[in-house]
């Protein structure tokens, strides 16, 4: 069974760094918006039946920019089996607008709170259990740059995608 997992989030939140770590790719990473303007595809290092899609960084699913059109069309048109929503742990509030839009799509979501190494270094704490309960999705602490938590995020996404694939289609039952 093949599984498609999309990486979605704001610009500069670590999507491509996570993509490179999960796939063994070497996509260019830059510290400014607009580096990734098209979707990139790679096979998950741990399971070749899993395809990871690196989507351009966007602030909203409203298609105003080319990046937003590419990301929105993929999420709505091709409907991946799961989404890893990467958010910048050093600026959660800015990221949650897109997160709520993504969750409204009805596609299983794992939220990966990235840059946790920086959050902890600054002495801040993010209550991921509380965030998970409030949002209604799995929340995992990661550092894409250091590689911590990334396999947990990927495996949770694979798990929820597999459960979705095994569930009967409600429309076909009626």
Task: Kindly give the residue locations of the regions a language model identified.
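Conserved G1/Walker A P-loop phosphate-binding module
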Residues: 1-64, 77-78, 82
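Alpha-helical scaffold segments in soluble metabolic enzymes
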Residues: 17, 21, 70, 152, ...
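Signal for well-folded cores of large energy- and translation-related assemblies
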Residues: 23, 60, 75-76, 103, ...
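Conserved nucleotide-binding/hydrolysis micro-motifs of P-loop NTPases
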Residues: 25, 34, 57-58, 89-93, ...
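Helical mechanochemical/support elements of P-loop NTPase systems and associated helical scaffolds
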Residues: 33-37, 51, 67-70, 79, ...
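Conserved C-terminal guanine-recognition region of P-loop GTPase G domains, centered on the G4
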Residues: 42-47, 70-140
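Canonical P-loop GTPase G-domain recognition
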Residues: 117-169
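Conserved small/polar residues in nucleotide/adenosyl-binding loops
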Residues: 173-174
């Amino acid at each position: 069974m093949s599984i498609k997992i999309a990486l979605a989030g704001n610009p500069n939140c670590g999507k491509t760094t996570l993509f490179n770590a999960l796939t063994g790719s070497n996509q260019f990473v830059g510290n400014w918006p607009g580096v990734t303007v098209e979707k990139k595809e790679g096979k998950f290092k741990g399971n070749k039946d899993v395809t990871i899609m690196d989507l351009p960084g966007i602030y909203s699913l409203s298609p105003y920019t080319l990046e937003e059109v590419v990301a929105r069309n993929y999420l709505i048109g091709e409907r991946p089996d799961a989404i890893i929503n990467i958010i910048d742990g050093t600026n959660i509030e800015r990221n949650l607008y897109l997160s709520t839009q993504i969750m409204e799509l009805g596609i299983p979501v794992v939220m990966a709170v990235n840059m946790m190494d920086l959050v902890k270094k600054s002495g801040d704490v993010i209550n991921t259990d509380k965030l998970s309960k409030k949002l209604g999705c799995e929340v995992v602490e990661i550092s894409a740059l250091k590689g911590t938590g990334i396999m947990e995020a990927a495996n949770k996404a694979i798990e929820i995608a597999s459960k979705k694939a095994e569930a009967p289609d409600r429309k076909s039952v009626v």
